[in-house]
């Protein structure tokens, strides 16, 4: 395995995050912070605690996972689609790099970027709502697993997309119903008695 190639692809993608810091890190953090302010603090202050858990604390995991899903897919799909669109992917394909090494580089960078955004959102949430994490190691494991899984899914979307419309419509058709169905089958929609 060519670790130099993996490292080169990984750091090239991480450098792209540095160049587009506002849209890749600050934008999702600010939009999620607005949810924490509106739903967690303002509306959550009017809802009584249920079994010692405030409404603001209750919505933090859902908002965190929703951001991780969308960021993992968009980071990975755009990361492979844009070089394909501009033609610079041929330089990577001409190099002595296996397909597995390309996947590890792109998906690893996408998962890292998404995890960074997730950790920043988690830290930001503590400013707006009272947050207590019961199992931090399990939570971190699930965050990493979610980032890797949906980064692989986004990489596949980026490979199969022919234009920018396909790049955006597939997550809209698949991820949005997935998130809505997870909300529907989860505990908030079931009676508690």
Walk through the language-model features, giving the residues of each.
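Hydrophobic transmembrane alpha-helices and immediately adjacent juxtamembrane helices
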Residues: 1-137, 141-186, 190
